[in-house]
Regions:
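Short, surface-exposed coil-to-beta transition loops
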Residues: 3-5, 60-64, 85-90
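Hydrophobic pocket/interface hotspot
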Residues: 17-27, 50, 67, 77, ...
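Beta-strand elements of well-folded, non-transmembrane domains
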Residues: 10-12, 54-58, 71, 95-97, ...
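Short beta-strand segments that buttress and anchor functional surface loops
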Residues: 49-56, 75-82
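Hydrophobic ligand-binding cavity/cleft-lining segments
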Residues: 1-46, 159-166
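Short, highly charged C-terminal tails/helix-capping segments
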Residues: 35-38, 135-166
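Beta-strand/loop substructures that line and gate deep hydrophobic ligand-binding cavities in soluble
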Residues: 79-132, 149-150
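A short, structured loop/turn motif at beta-sheet edges
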Residues: 11-15, 43-46, 68-73, 92-102
């Protein structure tokens, strides 16, 4: 297994960033990742199936992923079919100041067959790809291109103070 870990700060609140990382309709519509072809296969409450095609090291890699948001707010993308079967991406989040979020990615890809022979090169390619996709997400979020769906927004009741003397 080849594993890479990376991360970075995004200047948006954690709830917005977490929502962004599971909103594949937005990613497809806005072409957040130009080098990545995404297709939504199915969406059910708590789980999505995504087809992802990318070119890496001169090869076209196609995978089917199951995406779940975990109870702690992190996201787990598990490869259930394709080139990287058995691989995964875990995306974690923590607040980093008032309106910022630190995002960390852990990418795991099985290194069997030809991948075992090029594992060091694969690791470099995975790290570059992970950093690039994180930078694309950061640009999209910090440019104000993303707003969570209203169904995902928690609205606090408006508290008013009576101006009448009692």
């Amino acid at each position: 297994m080849v594993t890479v870990i990376t991360g970075g700060r995004i200047e948006r609140p954690i709830s917005v960033v977490q929502s962004h990382f599971v909103d594949f309709e937005h990613h497809v519509r806005q072409k957040v990742h130009p080098g990545l072809a995404l297709r939504i296969l199915s969406q059910e409450r708590g789980e999505q199936r995504i087809e992802q095609t990318v070119k890496m090291l001169g090869l076209t890699l196609k995978d089917e992923l199951v995406v779940r948001q975990l109870p702690d707010g992190s996201v787990l993308e598990t490869v259930v079919a394709g080139t990287n079967l058995g691989g995964s991406i875990h995306i974690g989040f923590r607040e980093d100041g008032t309106n910022a979020t630190f995002v960390y990615l852990t990418v795991r890809v099985p290194a069997e067959g030809w991948k075992a022979r090029v594992a060091p090169l694969l690791k470099v390619g995975l790290l570059l790809a992970a950093n690039q996709t994180l930078a694309e997400d950061r640009r999209d979020l910090e440019a104000g291109n993303y707003y969570p769906k209203m169904s995902e927004v928690t609205v606090e009741p408006l508290r008013t103070r009576s101006t009448l003397a009692t």
